Amino acid sequence: MSVERRGAAIEIAHLNKVYGNGSAALVALDDINLHVAPGEFLCIVGPSGCGKSTLLRILAGLDQQTSGRIDIQAAGWAVQNAMVFQDSGLFPWMRVASNVGFGLFTRGVPAAEQAVRVEAALKLVGLTKFRNHFPHQLSGGMRQRGAIARAFVTDPAMLLMDEPFAALDAQNRAILQAELVRIWEESGKTVVYITHSIEEALLLGDRTVVMTAQPGRIKEIIDVPFPHPRNLMALSASAAFGRLKLDIWRLLEDEVNRARAEIER
């Protein structure tokens, strides 16, 4: 059962990101305007190099926009955001439990509270039995579970995810997609999720943002009408799913062709 939604609200207005100056300037993001509702699961798709990851890094505070405004409302939360990358980023010399609790340790959370929160996070992702394992003893899917637990244990208002399941095999990807949706529904957090997969965006997201080729702009924002929980096999048999997937594919195809034409000029 889902909880009352309470994650961060995000307002982005006229955001631009430019690398370099003068004739060498590279416009990565151009006039991005976007509202993300509290507790929304927002997916972003776009051609390679369109600025998806740059936008996520700016939201995370790991990079700074050149101009424009970002307003994140996360009142009552100790931690504004946490980020999960394609690589789990678990420290190889730490056991799983220590990896998951690292963010709590660096914030000076008392040891007793750390232990309780780490155990809860491990249980959430199904890693309780592997708490004393090292990352090299885990499968790729289990390492990503650890990364998700590490992100959730700090109780962030929003979760920023940059293609977290892209390197996994189809079976593990499907399992973790379902787990992520379950955890999201239980927690009420806001999720911003980057993917190259149209199917994944339609499987997970409330809305899908389609970005243009560089410079990255928002080309279209598409509502995903299918109720959660979603099953990819069932969705694939749906005519509405097929039409929506084709619509997004055509939007992306136009951008890929435009980018190729620019290169070949």
Residue ranges and their predicted role:
Residues 159-162:
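Catalytic Walker B motif of ABC-type/P-loop ATPase nucleotide-binding domains
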Residues 94-102:
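Short coil-to-helix segment of the ABC ATPase nucleotide-binding domain corresponding to the Q-loop/switch region
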Residues 45-47:
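The feature captures the beta-strand-to-loop junction immediately N-terminal to the Walker
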Residues 60:
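Helix-to-loop junction immediately C-terminal to a conserved catalytic motif
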